[in-house]
């Protein structure tokens, strides 16, 4: 992929922008033919065959911030488009567009603290289709609330959010903020006269409290508590018999719900030593719980997890060079996990097996570790060449091993 960033700072205002193109492939993807599945779950298009999925992403971001006397304000705009496809059966083609806008304001409330407020909005749309060209037949295609092969459209135009916060204008002190976001999305089956099959609503609440203390100008420490709660509700529409290929809506039922909690307590210590050396340590412990329920036929799944982790970093800056190395690791311990379902005549053996396999991995302990290396070299008086290397691995008790390797070369001017 390629990425370009710009930042211009003047006396009373600043501008920034970003442009990105990324081309990649997801290997051996099964039971999901929908892009951005985290956003649209549980109403996904799926099949048991799957395969490699190619994806292209285009992204643009721009922002402006200014200061008038003691008031600071700004805005940020971003747009991302993507296309995902496969050249063999089953052949999904997913196109997405994601437009976001946020505005913020910071006002002093005392000689040491400022009050922050922000609002945001989002427009998201996805067209999700799947086709078969083989003469040997087709595989079964599933909607996770039904089955069949259809041309689907996801359209969401009800995203809004906001946050309130307080931060200090000094190098040490308290920082706090709370935020709320709401997103709704409707699944429409276009081949059935734009039939509105189901809709999903997601409420997200988040909060953060941080304290930072500087010691003699060369050392600092801090502690942070964060919390996040997400409520997701899925409503399925009920239709009568078709007349002239039009299905009348006769009711609706809230069938799916999920509750996700996450608490995190972290700290940091940072020290600046002689000859440009800098050291830091960041311990953290996370607690999370996810509980999902489908009303009829009754199905439940819940997982609790505690994850301690630590990150260590060292860096050195000289006249022309900057070097930084960070290593970290975590260990996730799951407990009190539960899976329950009521046998039903509409059960699908393949889909049920995939669901149980997913639960097995979610309720499995795992260990993860990573390393990040950055090397920057000044070229002339106005340019900088930077190399970034990153590698990590997660090992699950279910014998799954996930490896992540990334390398980047940047030219800054």
Whereabouts are the PLM-identified features?
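Outer-membrane beta-barrel "beta-signal"
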Residues: 111, 401-413
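Long, internal scaffold/assembly segments composed of regular secondary structure
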Residues: 149-285
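Outer-membrane beta-barrel translocator domains and adjoining extracellular loop/strand segments
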Residues: 28-34, 85-93, 128-135, 186-195, ...
């Amino acid at each position: 992929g390629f990425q370009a960033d710009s930042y211009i700072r003047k006396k009373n205002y600043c501008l920034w922008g970003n442009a990105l193109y990324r081309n990649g492939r997801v290997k051996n993807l099964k039971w999901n033919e929908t892009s951005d599945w985290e956003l649209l779950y549980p109403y996904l298009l799926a099949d048991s065959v799957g395969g490699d999925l190619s994806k292209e992403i285009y992204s643009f971001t721009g922002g402006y911030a200014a200061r008038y006397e003691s008031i600071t304000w700004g805005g940020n705009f971003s747009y991302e488009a993507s296309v995902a496809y496969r050249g063999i059966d089953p052949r999904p083609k997913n196109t997405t567009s994601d437009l976001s806008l946020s505005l913020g304001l910071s006002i002093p409330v005392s000689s040491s603290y400022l009050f922050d407020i922000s609002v945001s909005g989002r427009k998201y749309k996805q067209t999700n289709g799947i086709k078969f060209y083989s003469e040997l037949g087709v595989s079964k295609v599933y909607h996770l609330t039904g089955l069949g092969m259809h041309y689907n459209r996801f359209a969401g135009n009800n995203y809004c959010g906001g946050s309130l916060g307080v931060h200090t204008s000094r190098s040490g002190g308290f920082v706090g903020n709370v935020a709320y976001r709401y997103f709704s999305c409707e699944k429409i089956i276009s081949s059935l006269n734009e039939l509105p099959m189901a809709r999903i609503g997601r409420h997200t609440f988040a909060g953060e409290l941080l304290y930072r203390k500087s010691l003699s100008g060369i050392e600092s420490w801090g502690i942070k508590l964060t919390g996040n709660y997400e409520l997701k509700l899925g409503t399925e529409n009920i239709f009568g018999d078709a007349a002239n290929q039009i299905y009348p809506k006769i009711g609706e039922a809230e069938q799916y719900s999920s509750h996700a909690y996450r608490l995190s307590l972290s700290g940091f210590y940072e020290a600046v030593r002689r000859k440009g050396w800098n050291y830091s340590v960041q311990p953290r412990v996370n607690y999370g719980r996810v509980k999902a329920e489908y009303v009829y036929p009754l199905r439940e799944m819940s997982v609790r997890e505690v994850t301690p982790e630590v990150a260590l970093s060292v860096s050195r800056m000289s006249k022309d060079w900057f070097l930084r190395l960070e290593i970290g690791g975590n260990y996730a311990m799951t407990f009190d996990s539960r899976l329950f379902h009521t046998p039903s005549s509409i059960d699908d053996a393949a889909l049920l097996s995939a669901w149980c396999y997913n639960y097995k991995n979610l309720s499995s302990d795992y260990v993860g570790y990573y390393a990040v290396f950055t090397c920057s070299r000044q070229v002339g008086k106005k340019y900088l060449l930077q190399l970034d290397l990153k590698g990590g691995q997660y090992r699950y008790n279910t014998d799954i091993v996930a490896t992540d390797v990334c390398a980047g070369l940047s030219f800054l001017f």
